[in-house]
C-alpha cells in the first residue's frame, strides 16, 4: 500500500510539474526573446537561449514614440490606476457600511440588483456608457476611467466589504454611540480599522484591474501622449510596416512587474 501511494504521489507531482512548465513556458519565452534582436525573434523561436544577449530592445522601447518616452506612459497608468483605486475603495466601503448596518426600504432589492450587475458582461454597457460620456464631454480625457469608480460601481468590492462588516459585532457600534460617536465616527473609527484586510484586498485587485485595462483606454483616450502602458504597447505593432516585437516584449515585462 505504501509503495502504491508513493508511486501515485510521484506520478501526481510529475504531472503537476509538467503542467506548470507548460503554463510558464510562454512567459519564459517572452522574457528570453526580449534579449534577442527583433529580426531573429521568430527565426529562432524554438530556442529559448539567445545566441547573443542584447539590451537594445529595452533601450529602444524606453525611448517611446514621437518624443514621448515610455516613462510618460507608466506615469499615466499609475495616475489612472491609483485614482480609480482610491475611488473604488472609498465608495465601496461607504456603500458596504450602508448595506450591512442600516435598514431602509428596498434594501434587499437594491442589493440583489447590485449582485446581478456583476453578471452583466462589460460589453452590454459599453455603448450606452460611451454615448453618455460623449454628451458630458468626457471622451478624450481620463474622466471616464476615474470618476465612475467614486460611485461604487463595482459590486464585487461592495459585496466583499459588506460581508466583512456584517461579521463585526453590532455591540461595538452601540458602545461607540453611547460614548457619543455619530454614524460617521463609528464608520471611520470602528469599522474601517476592523476591515483593513478587505480594504487592502479591494485595493490590490482594483489596482491590478485598472493597470491591465486596455479596452476602456482604447475607447476614451485619443491622444498618444495620454496613453496608459496597456494601450501604448500596441504602438509597437504596425500592420503597414515592420513591428518591433522585441521592444514590445521588453516594455511588457516592465509593465507586468
Task: Tell where the protein language model's regions lie, with residue ranges.
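A structural signal for multi-pass alpha-helical bundles of membrane permease subunits
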Residues: 2-255
Amino acid at each position: 500500500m505504501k509503495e502504491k501511494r508513493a508511486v501515485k504521489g510521484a506520478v501526481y507531482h510529475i504531472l503537476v510539474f509538467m503542467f506548470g512548465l507548460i503554463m510558464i513556458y510562454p512567459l519564459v519565452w517572452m522574457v528570453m526573446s526580449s534579449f534577442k534582436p527583433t529580426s531573429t525573434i521568430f527565426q529562432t523561436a524554438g530556442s529559448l537561449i539567445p545566441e547573443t544577449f542584447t539590451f537594445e530592445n529595452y533601450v529602444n522601447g524606453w525611448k517611446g514614440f514621437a518624443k514621448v518616452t515610455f516613462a510618460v506612459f507608466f506615469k499615466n497608468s499609475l495616475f489612472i490606476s491609483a485614482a480609480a483605486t482610491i475611488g473604488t475603495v472609498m465608495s465601496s466601503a461607504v456603500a458596504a457600511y450602508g448595506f450591512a448596518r442600516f435598514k431602509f426600504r428596498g434594501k434587499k432589492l437594491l442589493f440583489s440588483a447590485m449582485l446581478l450587475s456583476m453578471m452583466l458582461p462589460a460589453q452590454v454597457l459599453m455603448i450606452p456608457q460611451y454615448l453618455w460620456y460623449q454628451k458630458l464631454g468626457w471622451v478624450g480625457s481620463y474622466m471616464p476611467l476615474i470618476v465612475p469608480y467614486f460611485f461604487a460601481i463595482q459590486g464585487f468590492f461592495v459585496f466583499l466589504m459588506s460581508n466583512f462588516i456584517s461579521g463585526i459585532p453590532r455591540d461595538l457600534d452601540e458602545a461607540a454611540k453611547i460614548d457619543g460617536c455619530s454614524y460617521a465616527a463609528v464608520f471611520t473609527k470602528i469599522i474601517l480599522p476592523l476591515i483593513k484586510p478587505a480594504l487592502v484586498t479591494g485595493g490590490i485587485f482594483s489596482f491590478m484591474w485598472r493597470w491591465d485595462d486596455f479596452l476602456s483606454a482604447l475607447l476614451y483616450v485619443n491622444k498618444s501622449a495620454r496613453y496608459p502602458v496597456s494601450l501604448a504597447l500596441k504602438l509597437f505593432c504596425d500592420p503597414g510596416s515592420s513591428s518591433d516585437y522585441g521592444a514590445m516584449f521588453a516594455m511588457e515585462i516592465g509593465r507586468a512587474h
